[in-house]
Amino acid sequence: MDKFQIHGNGPLKGEIRVSGAKNAALPILCAGLLTADTVALDNVPNLQDVRTTLKLLRLMGMQAEFDGARVTLNGADVNVLEAPYELVKTMRASILVLGPLVARFGEARVSLPGGCGIGARPVDQHIKGLQAMGAEITIEHGFIHARAKRLKGARVVTDMITVTGTENLLMAATLAEGETVLENAAREPEVTDLAHLLVKMGAKIDGIGTDRLVVHGVERLHGASHSVIADRIEAGTFLCAAAATLGDLVLRGVQPDILDTVLDKLREAGARLETGDDWIRLAMPHRAKAVSFRTSEYPAFPTDMQAQFMALNAVAEGTARVTETIFENRFMHVQELNRLGADITVEGNTAVVNGVPRLSGANVMATDLRASASLVIAGLVADGETVIDRIYHLDRGYDRMEDKLSAVGAKIRRIA
């Protein structure tokens, strides 16, 4: 099992090109199921979750080629309408094939999902929405089985904001008969990116970027070309690493406007920031000031950046309160950060971080994707050697992280 070996050694300096967004790429790949034509995608990150999704699509009969950051999909020969447990258990996003399969083929069998161990992420909102659109759904033997001759437009109000739920129902609605209104829709940039691809494929969608999506169903969708948006979480992770190490870092290929809350918190911590159309520069002249925040749905502070800011706060001046409102169980990195010398206590869904002047290297274990990233940041500022076990979590969401960090001065390497 691979590990990272890190020696803390001063500031990160240089340039990093940010990869495409995992959380946009996965639904966009699944959208290829909606048409028999070819869909060509650029800026696709080379990640474990992307490779798992392509494996699942090929299993269904999809032709899928992955060359560099370009993926070419053709769904003309899709004939297996099932997502088996063996693949779904490793990646919750597999549920995203449900909507497209029911919409185009009238049937789908999808195993109940697995993935990160950070609490309940119920799929009941997906099921509720598809039922409102006329699908007959049963759950038996660990599978969701959905059937519909043709989905019918409906007004769907989800009980909570759900990103994958919005994406699944949005894809399903594109081929439904009549008008579908998705109320309380997720507004994340990755949802917007999916909607832009669907429009290129011939879908009729109003309200893109808002919490009310109106979809006028069409008979069929056609092929299209699309470039996946930059990964705002990868960008935020590298910015936190630069801030923690008192670095001077330029990120290329990013969209600063979808990172507003993260950039605001970095400024509050004392970072100097400059931005252009597709770049961000961060310089950190002194030890960070502790910053308090609470996670919430976009455009508020993203839960996927909570752990990385926890690592920054661990070595900041002062005390920060970090409140997690999206997922339960999302403080599993606290115990590992404390092994490195951090002073963090958890009270319910809030962590209190008392900044310390320095951390010291130790052996730690990654527990989920973003927790892994927080341990990398902590390792970069810790005295001595830090070894992070179970980095397979990290490989699910970061494209060649060690290579990108090494190129800007980090002493980090992958060991078996």
Curated annotation (Swiss-Prot):
SUPFAM superfamilies noted in UniProt: EPT/RTPC-like
Binding-site residues, UDP-N-acetyl-alpha-D-glucosamine: 92, 121-125, 304, 326
Pfam family, one: EPSP_synthase
EC number(s) on file: 2.5.1.7
Any one GO MF annotation of this record: UDP-N-acetylglucosamine 1-carboxyvinyltransferase activity
Taxonomic superkingdom: Bacteria
CDD domains per UniProt: UdpNAET
Compartments where found: Cytoplasm
Keywords annotated in UniProt: Cell cycle, Cell division, Cell shape, Cell wall biogenesis/degradation, Cytoplasm, Peptidoglycan synthesis, Pyruvate, Transferase
Transferase as UniProt keyword: yes
Biological-process GO terms, alphabetical: cell division; cell wall organization; peptidoglycan biosynthetic process; regulation of cell shape; UDP-N-acetylgalactosamine biosynthetic process
Cellular compartments per GO CC: cytoplasm
Substrates-to-products reaction catalysed: phosphoenolpyruvate + UDP-N-acetyl-alpha-D-glucosamine = UDP-N-acetyl-3-O-(1-carboxyvinyl)-alpha-D-glucosamine + phosphate
This protein's pathway: Cell wall biogenesis; peptidoglycan biosynthesis
Active-site residues from the entry: 116 (proton donor)
Residues reported to bind phosphoenolpyruvate: 22-23
InterPro entries assigned to the protein according to its UniProt record, in alphabetical order: Enolpyruvate_Tfrase_dom, Enolpyruvate_Tfrase_sf, MurA_subfamily, RNA3'P_cycl/enolpyr_Trfase_a/b, UDP_GlcNAc_COvinyl_MurA
Main location, first listed in the record: cytoplasm
Modified residues (2-(S-cysteinyl)pyruvic acid O-phosphothioketal): 116
Family according to the record: Belongs to the EPSP synthase family. MurA subfamily.
Task of the protein: Cell wall formation. Adds enolpyruvyl to UDP-N-acetylglucosamine.
PANTHER family documented for this protein: UDP-N-ACETYLGLUCOSAMINE 1-CARBOXYVINYLTRANSFERASE (PTHR43783:SF1)
NCBIfam families named among the record's database cross-references: murA (TIGR01072), PRK09369.1 (NF006873)
UniProt protein name: UDP-N-acetylglucosamine 1-carboxyvinyltransferase
Source organism per UniProt: Cupriavidus taiwanensis (strain DSM 17343 / BCRC 17206 / CCUG 44338 / CIP 107171 / LMG 19424 / R1) (Ralstonia taiwanensis (strain LMG 19424))
